[in-house]
Design a protein with these regions (language model features):
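Generic structural signal for well-ordered alpha-helical scaffold segments
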Residues: 1, 5, 43-46, 173
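Structural motif
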Residues: 36-51
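Short, ordered loop/turn segments at secondary-structure junctions
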Residues: 17, 28, 36-37, 60, ...
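Short glycine/threonine-rich catalytic loop with a Thr-x-Gly-x-Asp
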Residues: 15-17, 31-36, 111-114
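Short Gly/Thr/Asp-enriched flexible loops that form oxyanion-binding sites at enzyme active sites
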Residues: 20-39, 65-66
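N-terminal small/polar loop signature for handling phosphorylated ligands or for N-terminal nucleophile
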Residues: 1-25
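Phosphate-binding and adjacent anionic-ligand microenvironments
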Residues: 11, 47-180
Protein backbone atom coordinates (compact mmCIF):
# COMPACT_ATOMS: atom_id res chain seq x y z
CA UNK A 1 0.00 0.00 0.00
CA UNK A 2 2.74 2.43 0.98
CA UNK A 3 4.66 1.77 -2.25
CA UNK A 4 1.53 2.41 -4.31
CA UNK A 5 0.90 5.71 -2.56
CA UNK A 6 4.57 6.77 -2.61
CA UNK A 7 4.72 6.09 -6.35
CA UNK A 8 1.44 7.97 -6.85
CA UNK A 9 0.23 4.91 -8.75
CA UNK A 10 -3.44 4.33 -9.51
CA UNK A 11 -3.31 0.71 -8.39
CA UNK A 12 -1.11 -1.62 -6.38
CA UNK A 13 -1.18 -5.40 -6.77
CA UNK A 14 0.03 -7.97 -4.24
CA UNK A 15 0.12 -11.76 -4.36
CA UNK A 16 0.57 -14.35 -1.65
CA UNK A 17 3.58 -16.68 -1.61
CA UNK A 18 2.25 -19.25 -4.08
CA UNK A 19 0.36 -16.66 -6.14
CA UNK A 20 -3.07 -18.24 -5.79
CA UNK A 21 -4.47 -15.10 -4.10
CA UNK A 22 -4.40 -11.48 -5.16
CA UNK A 23 -5.28 -8.28 -3.32
CA UNK A 24 -5.05 -4.76 -4.67
CA UNK A 25 -5.25 -1.21 -3.46
CA UNK A 26 -6.29 1.99 -5.13
CA UNK A 27 -4.18 5.15 -5.28
CA UNK A 28 -5.54 6.25 -1.89
CA UNK A 29 -4.37 3.00 -0.27
CA UNK A 30 -7.84 1.48 0.11
CA UNK A 31 -7.84 -2.31 -0.15
CA UNK A 32 -9.54 -4.00 -3.08
CA UNK A 33 -10.25 -7.49 -1.76
CA UNK A 34 -11.83 -10.59 -3.24
CA UNK A 35 -15.38 -9.37 -2.57
CA UNK A 36 -14.85 -6.25 -4.67
CA UNK A 37 -13.13 -8.28 -7.39
CA UNK A 38 -16.04 -10.77 -7.48
CA UNK A 39 -18.45 -7.83 -7.80
CA UNK A 40 -16.58 -6.28 -10.74
CA UNK A 41 -15.64 -9.50 -12.56
CA UNK A 42 -19.14 -10.90 -12.01
CA UNK A 43 -20.77 -7.89 -13.68
CA UNK A 44 -18.25 -8.07 -16.53
CA UNK A 45 -18.79 -11.80 -17.15
CA UNK A 46 -22.56 -11.22 -17.11
CA UNK A 47 -22.18 -8.47 -19.72
CA UNK A 48 -20.29 -10.96 -21.91
CA UNK A 49 -22.87 -13.70 -21.33
CA UNK A 50 -20.30 -16.04 -19.75
CA UNK A 51 -21.11 -15.85 -16.02
CA UNK A 52 -23.29 -18.93 -15.79
CA UNK A 53 -25.91 -19.09 -13.04
CA UNK A 54 -24.30 -16.56 -10.69
CA UNK A 55 -21.33 -15.95 -8.39
CA UNK A 56 -20.17 -18.28 -5.62
CA UNK A 57 -18.95 -16.59 -2.42
CA UNK A 58 -18.10 -18.00 0.97
CA UNK A 59 -19.94 -17.30 4.20
CA UNK A 60 -17.14 -14.83 5.03
CA UNK A 61 -18.02 -12.50 2.14
CA UNK A 62 -19.70 -9.27 3.15
CA UNK A 63 -23.47 -9.13 2.58
CA UNK A 64 -23.08 -5.98 0.48
CA UNK A 65 -21.62 -8.21 -2.28
CA UNK A 66 -24.90 -10.11 -2.43
CA UNK A 67 -26.97 -6.90 -2.41
CA UNK A 68 -24.92 -5.17 -5.13
CA UNK A 69 -24.97 -8.23 -7.38
CA UNK A 70 -28.73 -8.64 -6.82
CA UNK A 71 -29.20 -5.13 -8.26
CA UNK A 72 -27.57 -6.51 -11.43
CA UNK A 73 -29.81 -9.63 -11.37
CA UNK A 74 -26.84 -11.79 -10.40
CA UNK A 75 -27.48 -14.55 -7.87
CA UNK A 76 -24.94 -15.31 -5.14
CA UNK A 77 -24.50 -18.88 -3.95
CA UNK A 78 -22.94 -19.18 -0.49
CA UNK A 79 -20.60 -21.97 0.57
CA UNK A 80 -18.14 -22.88 3.30
CA UNK A 81 -14.67 -21.37 3.46
CA UNK A 82 -12.02 -22.97 1.28
CA UNK A 83 -11.34 -23.27 -2.42
CA UNK A 84 -12.63 -26.85 -2.58
CA UNK A 85 -16.04 -25.71 -1.29
CA UNK A 86 -16.04 -22.80 -3.73
CA UNK A 87 -15.21 -25.09 -6.66
CA UNK A 88 -17.74 -27.77 -5.59
CA UNK A 89 -20.49 -25.15 -5.35
CA UNK A 90 -19.51 -23.61 -8.68
CA UNK A 91 -19.84 -26.99 -10.37
CA UNK A 92 -23.09 -27.82 -8.56
CA UNK A 93 -24.69 -24.45 -9.42
CA UNK A 94 -23.20 -24.11 -12.93
CA UNK A 95 -21.34 -20.92 -12.02
CA UNK A 96 -18.21 -19.77 -13.85
CA UNK A 97 -16.93 -17.44 -11.07
CA UNK A 98 -16.39 -17.90 -7.38
CA UNK A 99 -14.04 -16.93 -4.62
CA UNK A 100 -13.22 -15.69 -1.18
CA UNK A 101 -12.80 -12.30 0.46
CA UNK A 102 -9.11 -13.23 0.83
CA UNK A 103 -8.58 -12.76 -2.92
CA UNK A 104 -8.63 -16.47 -3.78
CA UNK A 105 -10.79 -16.44 -6.92
CA UNK A 106 -11.65 -19.14 -9.45
CA UNK A 107 -12.77 -18.23 -12.98
CA UNK A 108 -13.49 -21.57 -14.64
CA UNK A 109 -13.25 -20.30 -18.20
CA UNK A 110 -9.63 -19.36 -17.50
CA UNK A 111 -8.38 -21.80 -14.83
CA UNK A 112 -9.79 -24.61 -12.70
CA UNK A 113 -8.04 -23.49 -9.54
CA UNK A 114 -7.17 -20.23 -7.80
CA UNK A 115 -4.65 -18.26 -9.85
CA UNK A 116 -3.78 -14.81 -8.54
CA UNK A 117 -2.13 -13.65 -11.75
CA UNK A 118 -5.13 -14.69 -13.82
CA UNK A 119 -7.57 -13.15 -11.31
CA UNK A 120 -5.65 -9.88 -11.25
CA UNK A 121 -5.61 -9.66 -15.04
CA UNK A 122 -9.31 -10.50 -15.26
CA UNK A 123 -10.09 -7.77 -12.73
CA UNK A 124 -8.06 -5.19 -14.67
CA UNK A 125 -9.71 -6.25 -17.95
CA UNK A 126 -13.15 -6.03 -16.34
CA UNK A 127 -12.37 -2.54 -15.01
CA UNK A 128 -11.32 -1.44 -18.47
CA UNK A 129 -14.23 -3.01 -20.37
CA UNK A 130 -16.80 -1.70 -17.85
CA UNK A 131 -15.10 1.73 -17.92
CA UNK A 132 -14.81 1.63 -14.12
CA UNK A 133 -12.58 3.93 -12.09
CA UNK A 134 -10.78 1.94 -9.40
CA UNK A 135 -10.73 4.97 -7.11
CA UNK A 136 -14.53 4.90 -6.79
CA UNK A 137 -14.94 1.18 -6.06
CA UNK A 138 -14.38 1.38 -2.30
CA UNK A 139 -16.91 4.20 -2.00
CA UNK A 140 -19.53 2.24 -3.94
CA UNK A 141 -18.78 -1.04 -2.12
CA UNK A 142 -19.95 0.29 1.22
CA UNK A 143 -19.44 -2.70 3.52
CA UNK A 144 -21.93 -3.67 6.15
CA UNK A 145 -20.64 -4.13 9.70
CA UNK A 146 -19.16 -7.61 9.94
CA UNK A 147 -17.44 -9.69 12.59
CA UNK A 148 -15.38 -12.70 11.53
CA UNK A 149 -14.22 -14.96 14.30
CA UNK A 150 -12.48 -18.35 14.30
CA UNK A 151 -13.28 -20.77 17.08
CA UNK A 152 -11.13 -23.66 18.26
CA UNK A 153 -13.15 -26.82 18.82
CA UNK A 154 -11.65 -29.96 20.32
CA UNK A 155 -13.99 -32.50 18.73
CA UNK A 156 -14.89 -30.68 15.53
CA UNK A 157 -16.67 -33.59 13.79
CA UNK A 158 -18.90 -34.33 16.79
CA UNK A 159 -19.81 -30.68 17.32
CA UNK A 160 -20.42 -29.90 13.64
CA UNK A 161 -22.45 -33.10 13.28
CA UNK A 162 -24.78 -32.15 16.12
CA UNK A 163 -28.42 -32.05 15.06
CA UNK A 164 -29.14 -29.27 17.60
CA UNK A 165 -26.34 -27.15 16.13
CA UNK A 166 -27.65 -27.70 12.59
CA UNK A 167 -31.16 -26.71 13.69
CA UNK A 168 -29.85 -23.58 15.43
CA UNK A 169 -27.83 -22.65 12.34
CA UNK A 170 -30.83 -23.15 10.06
CA UNK A 171 -33.04 -21.03 12.35
CA UNK A 172 -30.44 -18.25 12.50
CA UNK A 173 -29.97 -18.26 8.73
CA UNK A 174 -33.73 -18.09 8.17
CA UNK A 175 -34.02 -15.12 10.55
CA UNK A 176 -31.11 -13.32 8.86
CA UNK A 177 -32.12 -14.10 5.28
CA UNK A 178 -31.48 -10.99 3.25
CA UNK A 179 -30.40 -9.00 6.33
CA UNK A 180 -26.89 -10.17 7.01
Amino acid sequence: VRNTMDAKADIGIAYDGDTDRVLMCDGKGRIIDGDIMLWVIGRWLKSKGTLGSGVVATVMSNMVLEDLLAKEDIKVFRCGVGDRYVLDTMRKENSRLGGEQSGHLIALDYANTGDGLCSGLLFLRALSDLDEDISTLSDRFDRYPQVLKNLRIENKDRVLGSIKLKEAEENALNKLKGKG
